């Protein structure tokens, strides 16, 4: 579960902009990298401390807190580089498509 939390913080830190729940689901489900229920549990576990969740037009949108950014910088390297790169590429695709 901690690796999923780190992955979410790393995604938000790397892309530099907030992502909504559906975007996070789509990005992390690439090649079934993260189970949906594990992602939901991880989001619940980091909301408030490592990231904030605000509703925009009724949609939950996540962004890192300072602690979330620090966690991404400090622990992001614990994630395999191939996973970080794939998730970042997918995040850019999803974010630019939806904006």
Name each model feature, range by range.
Residues 6-10, 26, 44:
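Contiguous, well-ordered alpha-helical segments that form the cores/surfaces of helical PPI scaffolds
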Residues 33-48:
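Short amphipathic alpha-helical interaction segments
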Residues 58-65:
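Minor-groove-contacting beta-hairpin "wing" of winged helix-turn-helix DNA-binding domains
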Residues 1-15:
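Short alpha-helical segments that sit at the start of domains
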Residues 18-28:
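Short acidic, hydrophobic short linear motifs in intrinsically disordered regions
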Residues 13-20, 34:
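Short capping segments at the starts of secondary-structure elements
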Residues 66-98:
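Short, amphipathic alpha-helical interaction segments positioned at domain boundaries
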Residues 47-57:
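A short, conserved structural fragment
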């Amino acid at each position: 579960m901690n690796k999923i939390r780190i992955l979410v913080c790393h995604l938000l830190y790397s892309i530099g902009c907030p992502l909504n729940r559906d975007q996070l689901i789509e990005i992390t489900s690439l090649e079934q990298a993260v189970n949906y229920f594990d992602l939901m549990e991880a989001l619940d576990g980091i909301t408030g401390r490592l990231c904030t969740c605000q509703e925009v037009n009724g949609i939950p949108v996540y962004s890192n807190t300072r602690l979330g950014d620090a966690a991404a910088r400090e622990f992001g390297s614990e994630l395999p580089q191939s996973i970080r790169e794939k998730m970042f590429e997918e995040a850019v695709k999803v974010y630019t498509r939806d904006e």
